[in-house]
Every structure is written in C-alpha cells, then in structure tokens.
C-alpha cells in the first residue's frame, strides 16, 4: 500500500474508487495498491 498525495492508475487493471471519503486504487497487482493521504 502506497500513501500518496495524488493517486493515479498505473496499469489497465487499476481502478480508482472512493471509500469513506478516502480515494483508493485497487488492482490485481498488489504493488499497485494506493491510498490518498
């Protein structure tokens, strides 16, 4: 899980979703998981 100021899609499988006001990237590649902080 990377915590970043700006989250971006890294590959085509990445999806940007918003959970409880937190922007997240979910992907089948575990290294691509991100969260905005």
From Swiss-Prot:
**Gene Ontology CC:** cytoplasm; ribonucleoprotein complex; ribosome
Q: Which domain of life is it from?
A: Bacteria
One of this protein's GO BP terms?
translation
UniProt keyword annotations, A-Z: Ribonucleoprotein, Ribosomal protein
Task: Provide the GO MF annotations for this entry.
Answer: structural constituent of ribosome
Q: Which Pfam families match?
A: Ribosomal_L36 (PF00444)
Keyword Magnesium recorded = no
InterPro entries for the chain = Ribosomal_bL36, Ribosomal_bL36_sp
Q: Which PANTHER family match?
A: 50S RIBOSOMAL PROTEIN L36, CHLOROPLASTIC (PTHR42888), LARGE RIBOSOMAL SUBUNIT PROTEIN BL36C (PTHR42888:SF1)
Homology family: Belongs to the bacterial ribosomal protein bL36 family.
Protein name per the record: Large ribosomal subunit protein bL36
Q: Which organism is it from?
A: Ruthia magnifica subsp. Calyptogena magnifica
This protein's gene is called: rpmJ
């Amino acid at each position: 899980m990377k915590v970043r100021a700006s989250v971006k899609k890294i590959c085509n499988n990445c999806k940007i979703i918003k959970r409880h006001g937190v922007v997240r990237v979910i992907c089948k590649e575990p290294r691509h998981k991100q969260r905005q902080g």
